[in-house]
Structure formats: structure tokens, C-alpha cells
Amino acid sequence: MSGKGKVHGGKGKSSEIAKSSTSHSARAGLQFPVGRVKRYLKKQAQNKIRVGSKAAIYLTAVLEYLTAEVLELAGNAAKDLKVKRITPRHLQLAIRGDEELDNLIKATIAYGGVLPHINKALLLKVEKKKSHK
């Protein structure tokens, strides 16, 4: 054997159709970057734990869904106030207005303000005073 056999590798035949690479996000039908989420998962994993590609896809899908949900509610809040730009105040109103999102997101939103709320006990006293007069 002289070692002058077929050489594997290289570009291949020019007549073959070149395959264009598709991202993990495009294959999964997501907008958020699956590769970046996988990289963050690997970086945060303790003891060099292996991270499967399906775990990264699933986490990316969950993050995308939650973001879409919050943005939809914040957009509705902005539309109710007749403005075209979503501000932290709209995010605060959207998150605190939804019970499940309020339980999930406990963080303080900068420049979010507070929710308008009057205690029922205070309302009852005002109504009683008005009815006596």
C-alpha cells in the first residue's frame, strides 16, 4: 500500500448542492437563541454536568413564551392608557395585574410605581359617613 488512496474531507464534489447551516433556533421554530442559552447553562452548571440540547431548546421555548406573555399584557396596558410605547410602568401594571405572573416575578421593577389600591375598610367608612348625612 502506497498510501495514495482516497482523501476524505475537503469540500467534496462541486456538483453536490451545498447545504446551508440552520441554527438550533430555526430548527426548533424559536426566535430566542438556543445556542446562547445552552452556553449559559453549561457555564452555570456545577461540576461540569453535561447539558443536553433538548434541555436548552425547552428552556429557550419557556423563556420566549413568558416574554411574549409579559409583552402582550404590557402592550394592552399601554393601549389602555393610549400611548404607543411600553414603559416600566406598563410592565409593572401587567405583571402585578396577573396573579400567576405576580407569583413568578417577585422582583422590584425600577420606575414601575405602585398599584393603585384602596383598602376595603377605608371604603366602607367613607360610604357609611355619606349614608348618615
UniProtKB/Swiss-Prot annotation:
Residues 1-11 have a biased composition (Basic residues). Acetylated once deposited into chromatin. Transmembrane segments: none annotated. GO terms for biological process: CENP-A eviction from euchromatin; nuclear-transcribed mRNA catabolic process, non-stop decay; regulation of transcription by RNA polymerase II; silent mating-type cassette heterochromatin formation; transcription elongation by RNA polymerase II. Keywords: Acetylation, Chromosome, DNA-binding, Nucleosome core, Nucleus. The modification N-acetylserine is found at residue 2. It is found in: Nucleus; Chromosome. InterPro entries: Histone-fold (IPR009072), Histone_H2A (IPR002119), Histone_H2A/H2B/H3 (IPR007125), Histone_H2A_C (IPR032454), Histone_H2A_CS (IPR032458). The nucleosome is a histone octamer containing two molecules each of H2A, H2B, H3 and H4 assembled in one H3-H4 heterotetramer and two H2A-H2B heterodimers. The octamer wraps approximately 147 bp of DNA. H2A or its variant H2A.Z forms a heterodimer with H2B. H2A.Z associates with the VPS72/SWC2 subunit of the SWR1 chromatin remodeling complex. Also interacts with RBP1/DNA-directed RNA polymerase II largest subunit. Variant histone H2A which can replace H2A in some nucleosomes. Nucleosomes wrap and compact DNA into chromatin, limiting DNA accessibility to the cellular machineries which require DNA as a template. Histones thereby play a central role in transcription regulation, DNA repair, DNA replication and chromosomal stability. DNA accessibility is regulated via a complex set of post-translational modifications of histones, also called histone code, and nucleosome remodeling. This is Histone H2A.Z. The gene is HTZ1.
